[in-house]
Amino acid sequence: MKNSYKRLFSYIRPYMGRLIMAMICALLASGANLYVPWLIKGVIAQVLADKDMMMLNLIAVSIVVAFFLRGVFLYGQHYLMSYIAQKVIIDVRDSIYRKLQKLPISYFEKRQTGTVMSYVTNDVAAMQAGLADHVIDMITESVILIGSFAMMCWLHWKLTLLTLIIVPLVGYTMNIFGRKLKQTSFTMQERVADITSLLQEALSAIRVIRSFVREDHEIERFGKQNQANFIAQMKNAKLMAMLAPVVEFLAAISVSLILRYGGMEVIDGNLTAGALIAFLVYAVNLSNPIKRLSRVYGNIQKAIAAAERVFAVLDTEEEITDAPDAKKMPIVKGNVKLTDVKFSYVEGELAIKGISMEAQPGQMIAIVGASGSGKSTIANLIPRFYDIQSGSIEIDGYDIRSVTQQSLREQIGIVPQETVLFNGTVYENIRYGNLDATEEEIVAAAKAANAHEFISQMPDGYETQIGERGALLSGGQRQRIAIARAILKDPQILILDEATSALDTESEKIVQEALDKLLVGRTSFVIAHRLSTIVRADVIIVMERGEIVERGTHDELLEKGGIYSKLHQMQQRDKQEEN
């Protein structure tokens, strides 16, 4: 926990100037608060006894001024602390988002999207509440606590000793409850993350849910998660509800002892009635902050639990990093060479078993094989989305591990099977391939991708909103925009991962024409399901269980009569049956 406080403070450090000003405001506001009981003591001790009207008027005005100044200082304190909290949260969100952009693909494959989203939203929001509200309260109540204690010592040090009786008990109680509150708060954040994950998953699959008529099933699933969250929330609420009364009871014992012993002192003439009343007001001032601090302490445990979840993400190892002496890869010609490459997703189970291949600049290398044969893994290894266990991958003689990831991926364009577009306009999505591109270049890329015609027919042309993940477009339209985006990037190396397999025959023909334009003059790796799209490939590689079992041109492999030939015959037969 100490480490969490320390790390959280590292985000506050840049705003130390404002924090000091906020603390000064807190001190002055608390000082005004502490001044009022002293004025009341003066009323009882001097004004009522001496019937001093001038002093009464002065004290009355002083009380008004004290509360006015208290309000001014409280405003400054709350505004400054809110500013600090908001800036810290911006910095934390930026840090975690920056980290997420650098984490390996495998990190996201092992976690639900909603859980990752919850780190950036729910956990950071819990941290914000802790900083903006409860840190302010902790500062204010601590100042009142210390100030009241100091005034009590000045008034009657023997009576003050009675208040110290409860300090060890309060400290022990808050320590016990604090540990349990942190644990339940951590569970609460996990349950909220579970709800976010389920919600994200259900909304993404709403068509599937409707098609299988599983609305009631999903409602039941959500209800169970909601109930689990309720149970976690109530466990935390139970502890919070218990903490304040326990601390308040201990404080009441102290006040009763003060009243009993202080009353005897007044009766014996060792203490004035005004001093006792002032002392009791300060004692109440002492007990109230202790009671409020117990609640604040519990809420801060929630913020710390959320912070630890966030810091766990920030501490996640970046498995794929640039070498200390990594160089920027220059513009390449496109020679890609894999030598005895081995790779495994799970330790001890090789997904790629010593593969070697070479693509000359401008060549088209097609990779075919059954599902799970390792085709897409090869596509992920070339841009270094994963690191190989042994062997080497070289581009124009540069080992891809010896150059920066950014300079490597700038040379590679990828058109995946599942097209990913962003919520925005057609123009913005194509421009994503090159943020510095001109309007003329964007239109030219769209024309090359056979997309300009349908874009021009849209209500707002290139400024048409396409919806989340391009939901307002057809599959073929989405794919052509993705191709236009790749054309605009103008990479020397292309990876097409079954780019047309999900399209109907008509859409496939249009998209294939666009792909043919895209492939000209570029080294390309085409992962294909439909063999008709790779007939013109310079080399066709057939994979099976992570190994290359055949390689050659289309005609050579047909003549060989092996796996490729059988796949081709099967697809030809299916095509004839469809016709």
Task: State the predicted function of each range.
Residues M1, I24-C25, A32-K41, A45, ...:
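Juxtamembrane helix-loop junctions of ABC transporter transmembrane domains
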Residues K2-M16, V116:
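A short amphipathic helical element positioned immediately N-terminal to and/or at the very start
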Residues R13, I24, A32, V36, ...:
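Hydrophobic alpha-helical transmembrane segments of ABC transporter permease domains
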Residues L19-F73, L80, C153-K158, S256, ...:
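Transmembrane helix-loop-helix hairpins at lipid-water interfaces of multipass membrane proteins
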Residues K51-M54, M151-I165, K235-E308, V313-L314:
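Helix-loop-helix
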Residues I105-S106, V124-L131, V135, I139, ...:
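An intracellular "coupling" helix at the cytosolic face of ABC transporter transmembrane type-1 domains
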Residues D315, D322, M329-N579:
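ABC-type nucleotide-binding domain
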